[in-house]
Amino acid sequence: MPSRKTGKSIITKIQKKPGKIQVYFGKEKIELSLNAFTEFRLFEGKEVTQAEKSKMLSYSEMDADYAYALGLLGRKAYTEMELRQKLIANGASEESRRKIVKLLKQHGYLDDEEYAQTYAEEAMEIKCYGRKRILYELQNKGIDEKILQKLRFPQEKEKEASERAFKTYLVRFHSFPKRKKQEKMRRALYERGFDEELINYWIQRIPDGDPALEEDRLRKEYEKTKLSYSRKYEGRALKERLIASLMKKGYPYDEIKEIMEEERYEND
């Protein structure tokens, strides 16, 4: 309650709660962090100005925000931009965010340069990302261009990553015709962030499929597609849609035509 003589509020009661301290000024109550309470050396009967109250609350707010930030960083690494976004979402003020980021950087808990290097190494080793994808992801995480320019991507390491990705996709795309397999492989490796030279290197190493197996797949796909389109089309329209659909799936035009010729011969 404010003193009539000084205009200051007098602390009438102090109550400790789990993780916080409640300080009473008559009917008025404020809640402070343990650190804020200790920092301002509060006790019953002490007179406090309104400006001092504001400082206590700001200190306490920053204390809570700092603990929140440490909790986040204890679970995983963040870039400075990502951490700022988390603090904003948690309601931290601009001043609190600025001070917290400064403190975390001073204590080595927040280091964009170290983050970028670690991310680049792990993304290439574990996720099989190429240089372009890694730089793209780091830019989205707010890493400064000067830091990105310092990163080094050993060619041998990137080639090894591309090989692991290539082998994974070979298994995934095994049921497709070779041409479709090449299209999918090119797109997949491009999305992983590998450059054109590496992509072409692996495209050339896609093995030819078993001819008998490839033909069997085409014939089955031909019958399936024909059955679907024949419900709506016939004659030339059916033929055109059959060819377009099968070529889109990666089957060669001349092999499709050969099956059509066989079918026409059998029907004559």
Region spans (language model):
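An alpha-helical, amphipathic repeat domain used for nucleic-acid recognition
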Residues: 1-268
